[in-house]
Regions:
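Residues in and immediately flanking transmembrane alpha helices
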Residues: 15-16, 48, 195
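Short acidic active-site motifs
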Residues: 79
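Residues that line or immediately flank small-molecule/substrate-binding pockets and catalytic motifs
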Residues: 8, 34, 100
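Bacterial Sec-dependent N-terminal signal peptides
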Residues: 1-25
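Serine-esterase "nucleophile elbow" of acetyl-processing enzymes
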Residues: 20-73, 83-91
C-alpha cells in the first residue's frame, strides 16, 4: 500500500491525544487486524500502513516493537475471527487497529451479519488493548469502486454499499468509544489520480 498521508497523520494525532502524558521511552506494542488493506497488497512489508505508522511515530521519539499483523487478502469479518482464533496472539497490546469489511461488501454479504460480526471483533480488539477503548482505532473501508478493477461495474452502487458498511462500523466505534479514522474520502481521490494505487490498480 502506498503512503496515505492523511491516514498516517491522523494516527499520529490520535496517538498523541490519547497518550499525551505517556513516557516516550516505552517500547509500545501494536496489533493490526484486517484484510488486504492492512497487509498492504503488492507492496513491501515496510510500506504497509501498520509499519509506516510505527516508522512515523518513531520519528517523534515513540518506540514500537514490530507490528503484529493478523490479516489476509480476501478475508471477511468471519474469516478474520477464525484468523484471530488460530493466531498465537499475546493477551494484551498497547494499541490495536481494525479495518475489515470490503470483502463482505464485495461478496454481497448481509449488513446485519456484518454488524454482528464486526461488533464481536471490536470487543475483541478492546480486550486486546487491555480494555482501554482509547487505544483502539477503527479505520473505514476504502472505496474500490473508483479503481480500474471496478471497470464495467456500477460504481455508484459500490460507493453506496461501502458507505452503508462504513455507517455500521462508525456507529459501533462510537458506541464503544474507540477512535474512528475515515480514510474513505482519501481513497476516492484515486478516481482522478491512479498514482495513489498499488501496481494491481486496486489497493491504495
Amino acid at each position: 500500500m502506498k503512503k496515505t498521508i492523511v491516514l498516517y497523520l491522523l494516527c499520529i494525532c490520535h496517538f498523541h491525544y490519547s497518550h499525551s502524558q505517556a513516557m516516550s521511552s516505552k517500547n509500545y506494542t501494536y496489533l493490526a487486524l484486517g484484510d488486504s488493506y492492512t497487509i498492504g497488497e503488492q507492496v513491501a512489508t515496510r510500506d504497509n500502513f501498520p509499519h509506516q505508522t510505527v516508522a512515523l511515530l518513531a520519528k517523534d521519539n515513540f518506540s514500537f516493537q514490530q507490528p503484529v499483523i493478523v490479516a489476509k487478502t480476501g478475508w471477511t469479518t468471519d474469516e478474520l475471527q477464525v484468523g484471530i482464533a488460530l493466531a498465537a496472539l499475546d493477551k494484551k497490546y498497547d494499541f490495536v487497529s481494525l479495518l475489515i469489511g470490503v470483502n463482505n461488501q464485495y461478496r454481497g454479504r448481509d449488513k446485519a451479519e456484518y454488524a454482528q460480526q464486526f461488533e464481536k471483533l471490536l470487543k475483541q480488539s478492546i480486550q486486546f488493548a487491555g480494555n482501554i477503548p482509547e487505544h483502539v482505532f477503527v479505520l473505514s473501508i476504502p472505496d474500490w469502486g473508483v479503481t480500474p478493477f471496478a471497470e464495467g461495474r456500477d460504481r455508484k452502487q459500490i460507493a453506496d454499499e461501502i458507505d452503508a458498511f462504513n455507517s455500521i462500523n462508525k456507529d459501533l466505534a462510537s458506541k464503544y468509544n474507540v477512535h474512528y479514522i475515515d480514510i474513505t474520502p482519501g481513497t476516492r481521490q484515486a478516481n482522478n489520480d491512479l498514482s495513489l494505487l498499488a501496481e494491481d490498480q486496486l489497493h491504495p
